């Protein structure tokens, strides 16, 4: 059943995002996710999920602030790098710090600076709900990074065919 469920979930195409935090040493760390969702406009809330066994769980669960960075199609290299277990460090030339201390990745289609609103244990994951303090978006006509059936994919906007 688990394999069938994984394949069924994979048929839902999603965008790709990086969750980012700063450690006590001010080093930025990030993790690739595709479980991002908007929750509410009033109050401004968003959500994302993290597997309990993630090597980033301790770091992300301990932080009261985080940012969500929606990746553009040309940022696949960053998605790949931060999806793998390892140190998850984001280099200083890859981001700026926002007004609410969020790690804002250069080139992202959108960035959200958040405070943890709620953490919910949900099976083998934790559901994080963030209160959005600031949202930034790219006005350039760039394509998002899309994940579908276990691979990156391109978005074709209806009418562009």
Where are these regions (language model features)?
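Basic, polyanion-binding surface patches
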Residues: 1-161
